[in-house]
């Protein structure tokens, strides 16, 4: 730690009224670009307008101005998020059966959307139980509302109105901090202050206030709900906050107030700050007292973390010093210069954040089922499947975005002249070794993982089950995964005193939690089938990484096109007379990476969906016999490609294909429509630009003949635009097809 003389205290960090508010200017399409503002000559204009509207780098090269635009846009984004949240809460208040669900969450499905009868769509209002007809929702909002202690639709109304107020506030802030008081570049680059505020403020105080809310509001209300008290009889949230005796009836240590805290007698609080592990047998969710304890602990960690960096007082860490000290014996200059990169290139910063957030989102997907945090979430199979799928897709997109912005950084912001022998330079200098090794790994994984399946299909086809890789013939047990499971199953009591169960029931240990005759969670057995599909996961992930990383490392130059940096982030080919140089731009790598990301995530969510239906989800009889939805067929069926097609895709598609005439029929229509959207994408991906330009010429000829030719000349999409439209519809069609397939199936059988 370096002690320096304190910086001068007062800095003027904003410019007043830098840019006037002008509706006239905003009304002109393309006002941000001299070329686009001239108006359209050809139909390409509308595409360029969309491509460049948010590409602030193309509007100006002034980093301060770009930073202000990004900052202002963030407020706009927050405003939209608040508006969306408000809509969710409003639907809960106005169109939902939340209060009925609260009284009987095991037999009543959550619904917050009622279809109006216009041409017979009221068939979609299925009976979700308790005499309510509507569309079953799978977003998990009901469970999170119960966990936070919301007991009435009035409370949902109030929250919805509050969110609207915040949306308006954010909209105002976005305008204010661009037009009235715009921060200077130095403010955006003051990373220590930013870290302190984000760590201590957002994460620290945010977690602390949530922990406080849980202890004072959620826990007592959930105590009453679990005991079967009618929600209308439960005291209102403010009564618990204002009247300590009310809480003391539930948690006697409340009578002592803050005394145990200041006398370090903290064990007094162990009634409502617990470390139990496992699930609450009443709700099938994590113990809310464990969750409150967790948020309190997280708050303390982040409050400390928020006081670590040097700002106006000459004490604490400086990020630049930390980075420059970060050298190993084989890494040359190490992280020297990284500080400058991350404070002058927002693409580099964004890339890092997207990679982290994408990975974190995928971690969330896995925790949501292994450690279901909200009451009655684990037994709502449709919601569980939706949450897993949603977080997997989002994580995949964010990680591809990380590669995209890393490549944009390389093309637009990387300055090779002042980068020598630091880590990035060294990685770029041995990129051939990295990419060729990664390519070898992909080939190895691809042939071996699919080879195991093809072997099984062949043996199965020839009627030789004894020669297949399976739990009953040649076993390939995932021994490392089983060892990890076993270690965690035996961990309680060692990790924390008083912990009664392991962090997740999925580890093992024979415990099963069922709520209302439905399995919430039980130990998940892993076998040969999982070993096989996990190697497919390894294969698809490595190929995605290969494509994306090649795009980043060869974004500026390659043996084929040494001057690639001059061509920009996206270009179709390296000009006329250079055949074989198409699809090499950094943008094209993102484009190709998206398809493999789609492959990778699809295999993951298929694996999850089938595995859970086969080995976890199901009903339990009074005698304690568990009947799984697909009767444990995963281990024997998923070890051949044919099994995946026959027993997963085909067998489980029957619900969506046969949904016509029922309340699930919308999923049948979506299944059909999304297939069409997907097929439509192929038209853009398989044909070249010339084909369409030729077609357009003859259509224009016909218009001229009839004297109805438009002033704006029609043009075929550029090669890059065509690919963009293609991949968009490919992903949209594929994801919506999967969505309809999953939901129709799980709502019907779950």
Curated annotation (Swiss-Prot):
The keyword Iron applies. It holds the Pfam family PsaA_PsaB. Keywords: 4Fe-4S, Chlorophyll, Chloroplast, Chromophore, Electron transport, Iron, Iron-sulfur, Magnesium, Membrane, Metal-binding, Oxidoreductase, Photosynthesis, Photosystem I, Plastid, Thylakoid, Transmembrane, Transmembrane helix, Transport. GO terms for biological process: photosynthesis. Phylloquinone binds at residue 692. It comes from the Eukaryota. The chain crosses the membrane at residues 70-93, 156-179, 195-219, 291-309, 346-369, 385-411, 433-455, 531-549, 589-610, 664-686, 724-744. One of its GO terms (molecular function) is magnesium ion binding. GO terms for cellular component: chloroplast thylakoid membrane; photosystem I. [4Fe-4S] cluster binds at residues 573, 582. Chlorophyll a binds at residues 683, 691. P700 is a chlorophyll a/chlorophyll a' dimer, A0 is one or more chlorophyll a, A1 is one or both phylloquinones and FX is a shared 4Fe-4S iron-sulfur center. Chlorophyll a' binds at residue 675. It is a multi-pass membrane protein. Its EC number is 1.97.1.12. Its main location: plastid. HAMAP family: PSI_PsaA (MF_00458). The PsaA/B heterodimer binds the P700 chlorophyll special pair and subsequent electron acceptors. PSI consists of a core antenna complex that captures photons, and an electron transfer chain that converts photonic excitation into a charge separation. The eukaryotic PSI reaction center is composed of at least 11 subunits. NCBIfam families: psaA. Belongs to the PsaA/PsaB family. PsaA and PsaB bind P700, the primary electron donor of photosystem I (PSI), as well as the electron acceptors A0, A1 and FX. PSI is a plastocyanin-ferredoxin oxidoreductase, converting photonic excitation into a charge separation, which transfers an electron from the donor P700 chlorophyll pair to the spectroscopically characterized acceptors A0, A1, FX, FA and FB in turn. Oxidized P700 is reduced on the lumenal side of the thylakoid membrane by plastocyanin. This is Photosystem I P700 chlorophyll a apoprotein A1.
């Amino acid at each position: 730690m370096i002690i320096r003389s304190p910086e001068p205290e007062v800095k003027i960090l904003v410019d007043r009224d830098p840019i006037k508010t002008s509706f006239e200017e905003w009304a002109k399409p393309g006002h941000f670009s001299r070329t686009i503002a001239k108006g359209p000559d050809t139909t390409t204009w509308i595409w360029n307008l969309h491509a460049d509207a948010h590409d602030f780098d193309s509007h100006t090269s002034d980093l301060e101005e770009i930073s202000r635009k990004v900052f202002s846009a963030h407020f706009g984004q927050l405003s939209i998020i608040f508006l969306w949240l408000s809509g969710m809460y409003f639907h809960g208040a106005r169109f939902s059966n939340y209060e009925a669900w609260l009284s009987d969450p095991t037999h009543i499905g959550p619904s917050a959307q009622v279809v109006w009868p216009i041409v017979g769509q009221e068939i979609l209002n299925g009976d979700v139980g308790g005499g309510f007809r509507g569309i079953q929702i799978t977003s998990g909002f009901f469970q999170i509302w119960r966990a936070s202690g919301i007991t009435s639709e009035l409370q949902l109304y109030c929250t919805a109105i509050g969110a609207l107020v915040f949306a308006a506030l954010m909209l105002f802030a976005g305008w204010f901090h661009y037009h009235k008081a715009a921060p200077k570049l130095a403010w955006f680059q003051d990373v220590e202050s930013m870290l302190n505020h984000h760590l201590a403020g957002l994460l620290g105080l945010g977690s602390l206030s949530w922990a406080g809310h849980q202890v004072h509001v959620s826990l007592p209300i959930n105590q009453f709900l679990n005991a079967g008290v009618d929600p209308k009889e439960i005291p209102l949230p403010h009564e618990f906050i204002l009247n300590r005796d009310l809480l003391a009836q539930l948690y006697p240590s409340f009578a002592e107030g803050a005394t145990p805290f200041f006398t370090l007698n903290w064990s007094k609080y162990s009634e409502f700050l617990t470390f139990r592990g496992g699930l609450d047998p009443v709700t099938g969710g994590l113990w809310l007292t464990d969750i409150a304890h967790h948020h309190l602990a997280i708050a303390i960690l982040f409050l400390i973390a928020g006081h670590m960096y040097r700002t106006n007082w000459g004490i604490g860490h400086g990020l630049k010093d930390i980075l420059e000290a970060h050298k190993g014996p084989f890494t040359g200059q190490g992280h020297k210069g990284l500080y400058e990169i991350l404070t002058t290139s927002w693409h580099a910063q964004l890339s890092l954040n997207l990679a982290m957030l994408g990975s974190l989102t995928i971690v969330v997907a896995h925790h949501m089922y292994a450690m279901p945090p909200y009451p009655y979430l684990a037994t709502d199979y449709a919601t569980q499947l939706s949450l897993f799928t949603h977080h997997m897709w989002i994580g995949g997109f964010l990680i591809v975005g990380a590669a995209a912005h890393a490549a944009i950084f390389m093309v637009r912001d990387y300055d090779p002249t002042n980068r020598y022998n630091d880590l990035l330079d060294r990685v770029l200098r041995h990129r051939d070794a990295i990419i060729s090794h990664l390519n070898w790994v992909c080939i190895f994984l691809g042939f071996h993982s699919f080879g195991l399946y093809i072997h099984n299909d062949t043996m199965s086809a020839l009627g030789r089950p004894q020669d297949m890789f399976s739990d009953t013939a040649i076993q390939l047990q995932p021994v490392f995964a089983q060892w990890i499971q076993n270690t965690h199953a035996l961990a309680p009591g060692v990790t924390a005193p008083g912990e009664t169960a392991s962090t997740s029931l999925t580890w093992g240990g024979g415990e099963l939690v069922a709520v209302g005759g439905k399995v919430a969670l039980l130990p998940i057995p892993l076998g040969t089938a999982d070993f096989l599909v996990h190697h497919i996961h390894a294969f698809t992930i490595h190929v995605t990484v290969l494509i994306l990383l090649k795009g980043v490392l060869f974004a500026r130059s390659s043996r084929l096109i040494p001057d690639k940096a001059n061509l920009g982030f996206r270009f179709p080919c390296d000009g006329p007379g250079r055949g074989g140089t198409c699809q090499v731009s950094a943008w094209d790598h993102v484009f190709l990476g998206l398809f493999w990301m789609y492959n990778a995530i699809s295999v993951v969510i298929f694996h999850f969906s089938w595995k859970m239906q086969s080995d976890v989800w199901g009903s339990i009889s009074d005698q304690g016999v568990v009947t799984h939805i697909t009767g444990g067929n995963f281990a024997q069926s998923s070890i051949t490609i044919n099994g995946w097609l026959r027993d997963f895709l085909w067998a489980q598609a029957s619900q969506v294909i046969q949904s016509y005439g029922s309340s699930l029929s919308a999923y049948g229509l979506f299944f059909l429509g999304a297939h069409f959207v997907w097929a439509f994408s192929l038209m853009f991906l398989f044909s070249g630009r010339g084909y369409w330009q030729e077609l357009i010429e003859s259509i224009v000829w016909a218009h001229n003949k009839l004297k109805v030719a438009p002033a704006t000349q029609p043009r075929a999409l550029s090669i890059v635009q065509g690919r963009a439209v293609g991949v968009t519809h490919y992903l949209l069609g594929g994801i919506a097809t999967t969505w309809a397939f999953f939901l129709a199936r799980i709502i019907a059988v779950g």
